[in-house]
Curated annotation (Swiss-Prot):
Residue ranges of every copy of the HTH lacI-type domain listed in the record: 1-56
Coiled-coil regions, chain positions: none
Protein name (database record): Ribose operon repressor
Organism of provenance: Halalkalibacterium halodurans (strain ATCC BAA-125 / DSM 18197 / FERM 7344 / JCM 9153 / C-125) (Bacillus halodurans)
UniProt DNA-binding residue ranges: 4-23
GN (gene name): rbsR
Keyword Repressor included in the entry's annotation: yes
Any one GO molecular-function label of the UniProt entry: transcription cis-regulatory region binding
Organism superkingdom: Bacteria
Pfam families membership: LacI, Peripla_BP_3
SMART domains: HTH_LACI
Entry keyword set: DNA-binding, Repressor, Transcription, Transcription regulation
Amino acid sequence: MTTIRDVAKHAKVSVATVSRVLNKKGYVSKEAEEAVLQAIKELNYQPSSVARSLYHKTSGMIGLLIPDISNPFFPELARAVEDVASTYGYTVVLCNTDEEIEKERKYLQALKQKYVDGVILTTSFLPYKEYEQLNIPMVALDRYVNENIPLVASQNKAGARLATEHLLEQGCQFIAHIRGPKGVTPAEDRYEGFKEVVEEQEVANIVVSADFHIDEAQKVTRALLETHPTIDGIFASSDVVAAGAMKAAHMMGKRIPDDLQIVGFDGIPLGNMLVPSLTTVEQPIYDLGAVSTRLLIKQIEKKPLDTYRYEIPTKLVVRETTKGGENSENA
């Protein structure tokens, strides 16, 4: 393996001169620079990324922390982050925390030690002080951390209002909301949107909680429908939760949408593959990842930010789990 000393010897210059050429710092004569570049080419020398990281305290890497790689929402998000990051010359390091505080803490410390240039958080289980102490540029994606960390999110509350209003427009009289975990920003915002509408319209409603997992959503829905058989509409806090609700309804002999109408939230491809296809509130997942990455790189490059809160609109996509239509879209 060719070393920096081999390059120096081949170019007949000092190691320090080679280092100055590689790092573009300090004076080097034109002749010496050309000799070094020629030696690098002839020897096919590849500078050590580790050594360069130690020298510059930078790595050309961006960390992306996600809570659950098995949730179809996050691979699509990661694709956007990777696409944008690569156009700016950055490599993305994906860290799956499994919604565990200690895993998140260990990943962040490891990224710090490797001089990662910035981090995109889709998890936020640690106290703000721990994020602050890392002293790394950060962006929170769909998870509010603190006013000092820029947030990129969908208009979750407005989207939840769209979903709930649609169920009412289709004749639902007793609506259940299967909300996500408490303390998770998008779940809280969607719950708030739902509650606003049912209280404004004075509609019979019930709220239960479930993690963003199909199996738990199925169990919660079954218990819900057994206890309250007159429920005729469900607004699920994610498409994955909606899929679990659909499975429970099917196993109980409920006809969708005749007996029970269901609306999800996310707009992942899974929704269109289900039978019947899922009516959902679609959020621009790719745009969320792309905007977050550009915002992070702006911080890394020490450029001023226009705002610390970016909200991206959602839209209602009406399919077969509600009576509003088949594979039609409403803005």
